[in-house]
């Protein structure tokens, strides 16, 4: 197999979300609200425990009766927002409007940072003539994140679940990305952190490689093996 294109997941693969405490601090600052340090830490820990930060890598604690919404959350912007604000609202905050503000914050480029080797690997792939796509289960437009961090120039196609009404592991989402890049699935490598969701590319005939969803400091070179797989 000759790899001619690589599809990447977004969160936990190319980018990592900011820590939950930083997420909460930013929203409180923007709202001109102050909490005593102990209360702020307690609230951040509670948000972390329920998995309120989308893409934060923590399995969520779902509100009762929300299982169906959880299963289809990435198929629409409305569903994604409704699910994650419902998760967040399990934690008491000093102003109820902060839950929507937290959701808005997580969509900002400032809330995300690329892994240390992301730019290096994307640049090397482009130098080798390998096409790059991003396939993400998500409820909002992540393109500004790539632009803000100077990585948009490497990406030939973005295939986002909410824009297509289908989500990984549905092979149709990966097929859409392959079609957009003009590369056959059997010449494509999918790279992601979710064994079930990203592993769905295998049903289409793509090779699949997994990385660990870890804080950036603990995964400085997690993407570099992709270059060896491409050859």
Q: What are these model-derived regions, one by one?
A:
Residues 1-8, 38, 94-98, 119, ...:
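Asp-based, Mg2+/Mn2+-dependent phosphohydrolase catalytic module
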Residues 3-116, 143:
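N-terminal helical cap/lid subdomain that shapes the substrate entry/recognition surface
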């Amino acid at each position: 197999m000759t790899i001619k294109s690589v599809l990447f997941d977004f969160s936990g693969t190319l980018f990592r979300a900011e820590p939950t405490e930083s997420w909460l601090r930013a929203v409180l600052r923007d709202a001109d609200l102050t909490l005593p340090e102990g209360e702020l830490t307690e609230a951040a820990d509670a948000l972390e425990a329920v998995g309120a930060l989308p893409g934060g890598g923590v399995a969520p604690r779902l509100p009762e009766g929300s299982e169906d919404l959880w299963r289809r959350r990435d198929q629409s912007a409305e569903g994604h927002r409704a699910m994650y604000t419902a998760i967040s609202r399990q934690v008491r905050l000093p102003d109820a409007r902060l839950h929507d503000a937290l959701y808005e914050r997580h969509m900002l480029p400032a809330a995300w940072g690329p892994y240390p080797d992301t730019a290096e690997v994307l640049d090397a792939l482009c130098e080798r003539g390998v096409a790059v796509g991003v396939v993400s289960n998500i409820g909002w437009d992540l393109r500004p994140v790539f632009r803000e961090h100077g990585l948009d120039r490497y990406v030939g196609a973005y295939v986002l679940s909410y824009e297509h009404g289908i989500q990984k592991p549905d092979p149709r989402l990966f097929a859409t990305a392959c079609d957009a890049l003009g590369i056959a699935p059997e010449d494509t490598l999918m790279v992601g952190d979710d064994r079930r969701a990203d592993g769905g590319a295998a049903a289409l005939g793509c090779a699949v490689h997994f990385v660990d969803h870890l804080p950036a400091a603990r995964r400085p070179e997690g993407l570099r093996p992709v270059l060896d797989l491409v050859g």
